[in-house]
From Swiss-Prot:
Chief site of localization: membrane
Presence of keyword Transmembrane: yes
Gene: Clrn2
Protein topology in the membrane: Multi-pass membrane protein
GO biological process: auditory receptor cell stereocilium organization; inner ear auditory receptor cell differentiation; sensory perception of sound; stereocilium maintenance
Organism encoding this protein: Mus musculus (Mouse)
Function: Plays a key role to hearing function. Required for normal organization and maintenance of the stereocilia bundle and for mechano-electrical transduction.
Tissue: Detected in inner ear, particularly in hair bundles of auditory hair cells and is enriched in apical stereocilia. Detected in eye, but not in brain or muscle.
Family: Belongs to the clarin family.
UniProt entry keywords in alphabetical sequence: Cell membrane, Cell projection, Hearing, Membrane, Transmembrane, Transmembrane helix
Subcellular location: Cell projection, Stereocilium membrane
GO cellular component entries: stereocilium bundle; stereocilium membrane
Name of the featured protein: Clarin-2
Phenotype of gene-disrupted mutants: Mice homozygous for an ENU-induced allele exhibit an early-onset, progressive hearing loss, with a lack of fast-graded voltage responses. These mice harbor an early truncating nonsense variant (Trp4Ter). By postnatal days 6 (P6), mutants do not exhibit any gross patterning defects, or differences in the overall number of outer hair cells (OHC) and inner hair cells (IHC) bundles compared to controls.
Transmembrane feature ranges: 8-28, 101-121, 139-159, 188-208
């Protein structure tokens, strides 16, 4: 059985892995990966709007990996509309990249559970195989954190290099053309960053668990011999 010191740190490692699992689920379910401001370029061109009047033509948009919301501002007041990524909108995006992001996050969910299982195994017993010990915990956390980081990088690539927000904003728009004037990552994106950070923290936790504790030595009581002992 492992000592109490290692049990405490392995317990913390299992909690971090489980928290990463929960964070990914939250990030997948919330439609707040990115928000932005969209300008109705068609409306601006029609009325030849000047800078002070541009506010009337700037709407809002936010979205996640499955759904989102758009507020159109084309000079006649805001019109809000909800949209879903699947099954039609994804065809207008880089479908392969979007599906890859989802697959990576689902894989990260599985890897987070595996890393938690390995941490619990090391709490219960000392594995006889090195790959099941601290090295195994580190391996699965590196894989899980790396997969989450790859999903984050893929989403950033979709936003920056594949005009993700602009494609979503102009989906099924026949009369108006929208231009993205501002973008910022929202809580779901940063929740994924926190998930990857949890796995990185696990590497530190496992390293700390391997620090040998100083042995507490008790002084043996010196034997005293009395004259009575000699007589017997």
């Amino acid at each position: 059985m492992p000592g109490w010191f290692k049990k405490v740190w392995y317990g913390l490692a299992s909690l971090l892995s489980f928290s990463s699992f929960l964070l990914i689920i939250v990030a997948l379910s919330l439609p707040h990966w990115l928000s932005g401001k969209i300008l109705c370029q068609t409306g601006v061109d029609l009325v030849n709007a000047t800078d002070p009047e541009l506010v009337k033509f700037i709407g809002d948009i936010y979205y996640g990996l499955f759904r989102g919301c758009k507020v159109r501002q084309c000079g006649l007041g805001g019109r809000q509309s909800q949209f879903t990524i699947f099954p039609h909108l994804v065809k207008e995006l880089n479908a392969g990249l979007h599906v890859t992001i989802l697959l990576l996050l689902f894989l990260a969910l599985a890897l987070a559970l595996v890393s938690m299982g390995f941490a619990i195994l090391n709490i219960i017993q000392v594995p006889y195989r090195a790959v099941n010990g601290p090295g195994g915990i580190c391996l699965w956390n590196v894989l899980a954190g790396g997969v989450v980081a790859l999903a984050i990088g893929s989403f950033m690539a979709a936003v920056k290099f594949h005009d993700l927000t602009e494609r979503i904003a102009n989906f099924q728009e026949r009369l108006f053309q929208f231009v993205v004037v501002e973008e910022q990552y929202e809580e779901s994106f940063w929740i994924c960053v926190a998930s990857a950070s949890a796995h990185a923290a696990n590497l530190v936790v496992v390293a700390i668990s391997q620090i040998p504790l100083p042995e507490i030595k008790t002084k043996m009581e010196e034997a005293t011999v009395t004259p009575e002992d000699i007589l017997y």
